């Protein structure tokens, strides 16, 4: 049944209202499976062994090596590929991108003149924002995607941002010679599988009084892995192989850092973000199909697959009025 539903959805043959109803019910059923304290602790224990990131090649192919032109066509003007902040109905996607990034400045206590590392920088929305806002700061941007780093370099060159230093690095072998006042990581830890090793690396990159700021999506209580075990694991198979759904309290289980402060961002903020991307995706169908024709054997399936991704995630974050799955911000300081 699930296989037939996915087959039809990836061809645009199921009305959105039915898709959303099915996805909401399916998400709630998966929550019942995952909501187990023993399983959660097993997942957290597993985040203390093995490679920092798994399936990095698959993850890049699924998300980050999708043509840059696609993200330029679908995301907001800053290309922020993560949750944005709509503080009222009139806020545009572009304004919401900036509002969320401004919240990082306040919460991470970022100031001009600091050395800042954007770890898992995506398409450079935050790195470019910081480099322009803080001309006396040095901003280092790290991603394992060649396309992303080339995009950031091109924009930095256009804007003459000499204080921005983007480079391709695999987090498993992360090697930087600098020490930083702030390390900022936006929606990267969800792709990591050894938090303990990664936090140890970050601790060595920070100055003694440095701070780590993290933005993740999470569940209010439980943690679980995205693993492909059957037909129902469409999200893992197509978008999130090697990923994890963290719990809100995830960072309290690791000894390298002290959690100084946490903030919850209601999941409906991500629902709105995803629905805005979906609107643009639909409005730009002709352009996107042209981009996909040069990249995929079956561009139509990929067009509808991305639609399904946005719809699925938007419903997911709306459950329980955005209080079941949501976004969390953390300010952490290294334990001495």
Label the model's feature ranges:
Residues 196-211:
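A short glycine-rich, Lys/Arg-flanked "PGG" loop and its adjoining helix->strand segment in the class I
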Residues 158-172:
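Conserved SAM-binding strand-loop segment of SAM-dependent methyltransferases
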Residues 218, 224-324, 334-336:
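Substrate-binding/catalytic lobe of Class I Rossmann-like enzymes that use SAM or dcSAM, i.e.
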Residues 113-122:
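Conserved class I S-adenosyl-L-methionine
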Residues 123-135:
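Conserved SAM-binding loop of SAM-dependent methyltransferases across substrates and taxa
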Residues 2-71:
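N-terminal auxiliary segments of SAM/dcSAM-dependent transferases
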Residues 172-183:
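A short acidic, Gly/Pro-enriched loop at the edge of an enzyme's catalytic core
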Residues 44-55, 59-110:
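Class I SAM-dependent transferase core
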